[in-house]
């Protein structure tokens, strides 16, 4: 059996490979130009296991190894780095560290990997989010033009009447040209976002899990689909705190002895899902009585920012439970409040409100 530790970069990779039968160790650098990578891995005989750390440019490599029938294990970058105690860091040494973790039983920090379909749906959601951010920047610019010429329409500026009022403003030649171009671009963005929204809604309605999440007040197709595809298999999380940790909705902690110091959110998880949960909370807290009471209580205690985060976390945990137990909002309400620490409903694990543990998961 051949075990390969691979330090993967955008243009090259360094490998450290050991043959478990002969004990031979091979170190090599492969450039990604041409067919050098394919030829090397295709030439390996017998069972082969390759280990890499998760990166943003690894997809092509995973697909290549899958095509060649080679098993690839993807590791958590921070945990792989934590295994290195030496002060010297270079590509060859990084490959050796990955190899060492692969050789030592149960030491390699595997992460959960989404399926091809889930990755494709994530692309759809990220694409929509990028267009929405572009629209927001464009709206700010057009609002500035309107305010500078005493047109105070607020959100009504994006209605047909508001756009006509903006179009009718008498501006100098270059300002007029800029206004017209921005308005034309805004209309194009609106059409594209509407197309993407329709695609997201179609996907959400076709998926039983997402349809269940849509039954929760304030949760729309984008949030429902994103929760399903970014959380993945809900049973891989043992507690609610693990879900919050995975999304980055737990505070950083610097405690020692009897003194506990909690800081800002870790924000180590998926930023898009964290954003969508926070936005959905604004609607859910109006329509759901329990969430509304919780948000108002935190608003008095902690202020608006922390109250929104706390309510978003609570909403996200609800959606996770609905995914895990395959129930809709009506059944969730029938069961009552979340179980307290140490208690559980029939068929449900206890809700752990203690310290969050690190969760192995996809870095996408």
Predicted segment positions?
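A detector of single, family-specific signature residues
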Residues: 1-364
């Amino acid at each position: 059996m051949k075990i390969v530790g691979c330090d993967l970069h955008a243009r090259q990779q360094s490998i450290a490979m050991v043959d478990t039968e002969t004990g031979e160790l091979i170190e090599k650098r492969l450039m990604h130009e041409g067919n050098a990578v394919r030829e090397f891995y295709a030439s390996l005989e017998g069972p082969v296991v390759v280990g890499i750390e998760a990166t943003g440019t690894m997809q092509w490599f995973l697909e290549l190894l899958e095509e060649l029938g080679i098993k690839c294990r993807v590791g958590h970058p921070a945990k792989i780095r934590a295994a290195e105690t030496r002060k010297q860091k270079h590509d060859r040494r990084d490959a050796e560290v990955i190899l060492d973790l692969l050789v030592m039983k149960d030491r390699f920090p595997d992460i959960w990997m989404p399926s091809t379909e889930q990755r494709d749906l994530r692309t759809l959601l990220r694409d929509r989010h990028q267009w929405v951010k572009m629209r927001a920047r464009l709206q700010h610019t057009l609002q500035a033009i309107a305010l500078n010429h005493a047109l105070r329409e607020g959100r009504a500026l994006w209605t047909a009447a508001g756009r006509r009022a903006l179009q009718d403003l008498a501006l100098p030649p270059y300002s007029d040209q800029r206004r017209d171009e921005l308005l034309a671009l805004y209309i194009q963005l609106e059409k594209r976002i509407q197309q993407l929204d329709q695609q997201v809604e179609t996907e959400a309605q076709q998926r039983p899990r997402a349809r269940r999440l849509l039954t929760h007040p304030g949760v729309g197709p984008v949030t429902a689909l994103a929760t399903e595809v970014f959380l993945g298999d809900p049973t891989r999380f043992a507690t609610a705190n693990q879900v919050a940790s995975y999304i980055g909705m737990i505070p950083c902690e610097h405690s020692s002895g009897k003194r506990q110091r909690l800081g800002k959110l870790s924000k180590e998880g998926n930023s898009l899902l964290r954003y969508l949960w926070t936005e959905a909370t604004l609607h859910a807290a109006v329509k759901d009585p329990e969430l509304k009471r919780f948000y108002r209580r935190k608003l008095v205690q902690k202020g608006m920012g922390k109250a929104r985060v706390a309510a978003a976390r609570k909403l996200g945990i609800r959606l996770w439970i609905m995914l895990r137990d395959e129930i809709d909002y009506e059944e969730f309400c029938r069961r009552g409040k979340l179980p307290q620490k140490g208690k559980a409903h029939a068929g449900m694990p206890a809700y752990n409100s203690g310290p969050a543990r690190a969760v192995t998961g996809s870095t996408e």
